[in-house]
């Protein structure tokens, strides 16, 4: 059985809530909560965050996650 890869889109410049991926929720950025839940999915080999903002990329790397930059 092959393993799945989860890619989480995380855009910093949202029109309704700018900076949402970095919004602090009980001491962690929102993107970290999402990332940690994705790691719990059965059959997942890797989790990546796709972002167009270096602040999000650095936050993901700070908690040990994997991030890839996209064009904005």
Curated annotation (Swiss-Prot):
E.C. number(s) listed in UniProt: 2.7.7.38
Name by which UniProt lists this protein: 3-deoxy-manno-octulosonate cytidylyltransferase
One Pfam family per UniProt: CTP_transf_3
PANTHER family assigned to the protein according to its UniProt record, in alphabetical order: 3-DEOXY-MANNO-OCTULOSONATE CYTIDYLYLTRANSFERASE (PTHR42866), 3-DEOXY-MANNO-OCTULOSONATE CYTIDYLYLTRANSFERASE, MITOCHONDRIAL (PTHR42866:SF2)
Cellular component terms (Gene Ontology): cytosol
GO terms of molecular function: 3-deoxy-manno-octulosonate cytidylyltransferase activity
InterPro entries noted in UniProt: Cytidylyl_trans, Nucleotide-diphossugar_trans
Biological process annotations from GO: CMP-keto-3-deoxy-D-manno-octulosonic acid biosynthetic process; lipopolysaccharide biosynthetic process
Gene3D superfamilies xref list: Spore Coat Polysaccharide Biosynthesis Protein SpsA, Chain A
